[in-house]
Amino acid sequence: GEAYPYVDVGVSPAPASRDLPIWVGGSGAAAWRRTGRRGDGYIPMGATRDQYPEIIATIRRAAEEAGRGGVGFDIGIMPGWAYIGEPPEDLPPAWLTGPPEKIAEELRADRAVGANAFHLKFRARTIEEYLDQLAAFGEQVRPLL
């Protein structure tokens, strides 16, 4: 597409690699086709698991039509807020809560329909609680995946 020059603009921290993947986010067939034509990955917004086969097929078809057949791409899942364990009552609701086994089961179900990347956001009231949630994911959920 068109490019626009900017003066005295920077991005920090600088990317670790010059080969940056293009992730497309959105909902609907137009976003799926755009991913096939230009993207390296897709994050569906509000898609359900039963939509993933159609999403993946549409991306592959658009990639073929754009001469990008055989190019790999990632499909993500963004399930929303998570809390490992029983969330405190004063915490805003989270979509994915419960013991590590339940969270791993949900993420495995996403993988079974084609998602190979996920974006989880953890609910927490303090930075310490947030860091505890990250540690719990790494130590208790990740080994189950």
Placement of each model-derived feature along the sequence:
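Active-site-adjacent structural elements that line small-molecule/cofactor binding pockets in enzymes
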Residues: G1-L145
